[in-house]
Amino acid sequence: MEFKKVAKETAITLQSYLTYQAVRLISQQLSETNPGQAIWLGEFSKRHPIQESDLYLEAMMLENKELVLRILTVRENLAEGVLEFLPEMVLSQIKQSNGNHRRSLLERLTQVDSSSTDQTEPNPGESDTSEDSE
């Protein structure tokens, strides 16, 4: 497996997600303190996809350097707070989710097996109901 490649791609995805969360938090704050700038941020975010966080921030640098600095600060603070808990939390949630999916799959497999067995093998002592109705 390519653990290093997967880790790098995961880090990029997490970076973009933390940028999104920072923008969301700042937008909420601005809606209370500076509604005009909150509207501007919303419009900017519609024009520039935040999924590519580095491109998003580079585009914003051309229009609003102060807001970029605020996003960078909030994103870094979020990262510091989240990354402390993340490894253990992710592993725990994946193990729990995998267990739930395996249990569900096993239940479905046993239901399919028992229903196909019921259809092919009549229970002893049961008579064919079509003969009784004649």
Swiss-Prot record:
Among SUPFAM superfamilies, the record links this protein to:
RbcX-like
On the tree of life, the source organism's domain of life is Bacteria
Q: What is the effect of changing R70A?
A: No longer assembles RbcL8, no active RuBisCO formed
Impact noted for substituting P35A? Assembles about 50% RbcL8
Provide the assembly information.
Answer: Homodimer (RbcX2). Interacts with the exposed C-terminal peptide of RbcL ('Glu-459-Asp-468'); binds 2 RbcL peptides per RbcX2, stapling them into an RbcL2 dimer. A slightly longer peptide binds with a higher affinity, but no long-term stable interaction with RbcL is detected. Contacts a second RbcL monomer via its peripheral polar surface.
Q: What is known of its domains?
A: The homodimer has 2 functional domains, a central cleft essential for production of soluble RbcL in which the RbcL peptide binds, and a polar surface which plays a role in correct RbcL subunit arrangement.
Task: Output this protein's name.
Answer: RuBisCO chaperone RbcX
Source organism: Picosynechococcus sp. (strain ATCC 27264 / PCC 7002 / PR-6) (Agmenellum quadruplicatum)
**Species lineage, top-down?**
Bacteria, Bacillati, Cyanobacteriota, Cyanophyceae, Oscillatoriophycideae
